[in-house]
Amino acid sequence: LRYKIMTNRFIILCLLVLVSITNSSSLASNKFAKFIVWNENRKLTWNDFNAKPERSYPNMEEAQTVSSIEVGYTSTNKKIEITIAAKFYPNLSWHYSNINSSYILQHEQLHFDITELYARMMRKQISEQVKSSKDKSKYNSIVKKIMNNWDNEQNAYDDQTNHGANKTEQLKWENNIQLRLA
């Protein structure tokens, strides 16, 4: 399962790069075209999970959240503009139709919250350390490090909570992430 999650994130990052260099007409048909930008006032609902499960994962997954940290970088006349957003992809995220538990939904929401947490970390580090187009290698280093840490924390979250089955650990994670987002 860990390999699958890491692979999905790697594929997502690669596809985001490809999407950014394709023209806008092909973007409309792409599964990444529909997304939800993280907002503290907008929580996920089961209606946001529109993909069909690819296969059965007995006793492992009842839902899957696909989210990303989308990073945009443009440079003109030595000035840089960087945009960073935590995004959730409804057309890639799924749940089994017989699963409508608010508890499982909260577990999936926290995956998206962790994505936002790392988007904020990236925004902060880049704004503090990247001042001009000369800092592109510093920018690349920050992005790589944050993405790696984000992936590690997502995996630790699932491992320690047993995908939400361990309610004591789940509550610890919820409290920790909410404090870090505050």
Residue ranges and their predicted role:
Residues S25, N91, N155:
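Residue-level marker of positions within ordered structural domains that often coincide
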Residues F112, Q125, E153:
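Short alpha-helical functional segments enriched in proximate histidine and acidic residues
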Residues Y103-T115:
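Active-site recognition of the HExxH zinc-binding catalytic motif
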Residues L117-I126:
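Membrane-interfacial alpha-helical segments at the cytosolic side of multi-pass membrane proteins
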Residues L1-A33:
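Bacterial Sec-dependent N-terminal signal peptides
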Residues N30-K79, F88, V130-A182:
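Metalloprotease/metallohydrolase-associated module, dominated by Zn2+-dependent proteases
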Residues T76-S102:
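Active-site scaffold of zinc-dependent metalloenzymes
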